[in-house]
Amino acid sequence: MSLGGVSEASRATPEIQMIANKVRPQLEAKTNKKYEKFEAVEYKTQVVAGENIFIKMDVGHGCFIHIKVFNGPTGKDNYELHGYQTDKTMDEELTYF
């Protein structure tokens, strides 16, 4: 993957689930919802001045959310929610947003 390019989708790992869990309170505050299910399904990464991680989340009842998480160049696991897209389906591709 080149600098700035988005990787191919990969199956979510326990590390990706941990990252999603860290930004879950930020997402729930922004959407004003509590998600009973919050399971990472797949992800893509993008190397910038740090790293963007795009994660497809299964939030239950056939609903999915795409989240964009940023980790700064310090590499200190300072994850921040930088965007999200609601009303997604399992079949929708994760894309840059």
From Swiss-Prot:
Keywords: Cytoplasm, Protease inhibitor, Thiol protease inhibitor. It is found in: Cytoplasm. CDD domains: CY (cd00042). A motif (Secondary area of contact) lies at residues 46-50. Its main location: cytoplasm. Gene3D superfamilies: 3.10.450.10. The keyword Ubl conjugation does not apply. The record marks 4 as: Reactive site. One of its GO terms (cellular component) is cytoplasm. It comes from the Eukaryota. GO terms for molecular function: cysteine-type endopeptidase inhibitor activity; endopeptidase inhibitor activity. Belongs to the cystatin family. PANTHER family: CYSTATIN A FAMILY MEMBER 3-RELATED, CYSTATIN FAMILY MEMBER. This is an intracellular thiol proteinase inhibitor. This is Stefin-1. It comes from Mus musculus. The lineage of its organism: Eukaryota, Metazoa, Chordata, Craniata, Vertebrata. The gene is Stfa1.
